Amino acid sequence: RGLEDLSMILCDIGNSTVDCYQEGKVWTLSHAQFKDFSTKERVYYICVNEELLSYLKHRGSYVDLEPYFDFDTIYQGLGVDRIAACCTINDGMIVDAGSAITVDIMSSGVHLGGFILPGLEAYAKAYRSISPRLDMPINPSIALDALPQRTNDAISYGVVKPLILMLEATCKDKRIFFTGGDGKFFSKYFTNAFFD
């Protein structure tokens, strides 16, 4: 076989988007764009979206990686996206800040457990459902060292500060690995953080 036969695409299919990787290049597709995506290469994927998972079962050149993970944990219902992330580190805390914020702790290669929080957009949606006057985006530059003096900052502070405090209390001195659409946003609050 020639080297061109070894080309492949890796995809992480989340609840909101599909992140793809091929030969050092990374790109993001919407679910609709992914359904229209066409390639001659084999596509290896992990998927947490049930609709796309059903769709991909009938695509011959697409390979679901979930059955190939051998991950020992007592956690019930751990998603393949979290399993894949946990398999990449031996010690530390993994924070996938996407549609939901998932947090998992690894110690000496053992999964100690984790928790799930709403993602930033879910918090914003909750505020919108309370009142149209609270329909404001979460401000990623919110100062956390002083109490807010306007509604937009108060909303952002009320979302970001408790999340940061919870992550700090959980990670203690562990390294923190951030991923997901809002991972870069959260990583700036920690000196022991890595974003990928």
Task: Show where each model-derived region lies.
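Gly/Thr-rich phosphate-binding beta-strand-loop-beta motif of the actin/hexokinase/Hsp70
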Residues: S7-G24, I89-V110, Y127
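Short, charged/polar "capping" segments at the starts of alpha-helices
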Residues: E50-L56, K184-S187
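Short, Lys/Arg-enriched N-terminal segments with co-localized hydrophobic residues
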Residues: R1-S7
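A short, well-structured beta->alpha microelement
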Residues: G24-S38
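Glycine/small-residue-rich loop that forms an oxyanion/phosphate-binding "nest" at active or ligand-binding sites
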Residues: K57-I89
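Adenine-nucleotide phosphate-binding core of ATP-dependent small-molecule kinases
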Residues: A143-R175, D182-F185, N192-A193
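Short glycine-rich phosphate-binding loop at a beta-alpha junction
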Residues: K40-N49, K174-D182
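Glycine-rich phosphate-binding loop plus the immediately following alpha-helix
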Residues: A84-D91, L112-Y157
